Amino acid sequence: MKTTELRQKDVAGLQAEVKELQKAHFGLRMQKATQQLNNTATLRSTRRDIARAKTILVEKQSAETSAK
């Protein structure tokens, strides 16, 4: 997912996105454990997408608290 798409979402949307990505990552890990995953690069990209979403989420949360 692109950072521009993530930055357009609000805090609740980002939290939902992080949960969705974590579920997807868990599913990929289970596929890898049972040797059903063909493209292991998806694990890396999903993990990095989670990190991007969490980073932007923290930025937005800190911006909200500093604005108050």
From Swiss-Prot:
InterPro entries: Ribosomal_protein_uL29, Ribosomal_uL29, Ribosomal_uL29_CS, Ribosomal_uL29_sf. Disulfide bonds: none annotated. The keyword Ribonucleoprotein applies. GO terms for cellular component: cytosolic large ribosomal subunit. CDD domains: Ribosomal_L29_HIP (cd00427). GO terms for biological process: translation. GO terms for molecular function: structural constituent of ribosome. Keywords: Ribonucleoprotein, Ribosomal protein. It comes from the Bacteria. Belongs to the universal ribosomal protein uL29 family. NCBIfam families: L29 (TIGR00012). This is Large ribosomal subunit protein uL29.
